[in-house]
Amino acid sequence: WSSDVCSSDLTGLDREIGDADHGLNMHRGFSKVVEKLPSIADKDIGFILKNTGMVLLSSVGGASGPLFGTFFIRAAQVTQAHQSLTLEELYQMIRDGAEGVISRGKAEPGDKTMCDVWLPVVESLRQSCEQKLSVQAALEAASQQAEVAAQSTITMQARKGRASYLGERSIGHQDPGATSVMFMMQMLAQASRE
C-alpha cells in the first residue's frame, strides 16, 4: 500500500462505489507501519503483527482501519514468540485474522466485502497444508485465489458498507476492500520469493 499504484487503484475503485478515500487511507496507514518497523524489526512476529494492527487502528479511517487492525491483532495471537512460521502456522495466522475481520464486520460470503477474498484465501491455505506444499507455493496459490475472488466481487451486489447504499448500482464494480486483501496476498507471495 505504500506504492502509489496500489493507492491510486484502490482510490479509483472506491470512487465508483464508496467515498474515494480507501486507497489514501490504506496508504497512510501502511506508511505509518513502515515508519514504525525499524523500531520493532528485531521483535517476534506476533509483536510486529500486533503493533501493525494497533497502528492501522489509529491511522486508517473508515471501516478499513478497524477491520485490518483486527486482522493483524488476531493474527498476532497465533504468532507470539515466533521468529519464522511453518505453513500450518501461517494458515492458522491468516485464518484467525480473517475470522476476526468477518466477526467484526458481520459479513457473509456474497456481501461484496473483503470477506469474499479472505474465505477463499483461507481455504486455499488449508488445502495447501493438506497437500504439504512449501510456504512459497502455498502463498502463490493463495495469491492467485485472492485475485480470482476479488474479481468475483464485480458481479455481486453490495450488502454491507457504503457500497450497499447503491443497491444494484454496486454491481459491475470490484470491491476496494476485497482488492486490498488481494494486494496483501500478492505482496506476501512476492516476499516469499525474495
What does each of the following model-derived ranges do?
Residues 1-7:
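Short, small-residue-biased leader/transition segments that mark boundaries at the very start
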Residues 11-40, 117-148:
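Active-site-proximal helix-loop elements at catalytic-domain edges
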Residues 82-129:
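A structural-propensity feature for long, helix-poor, extended segments
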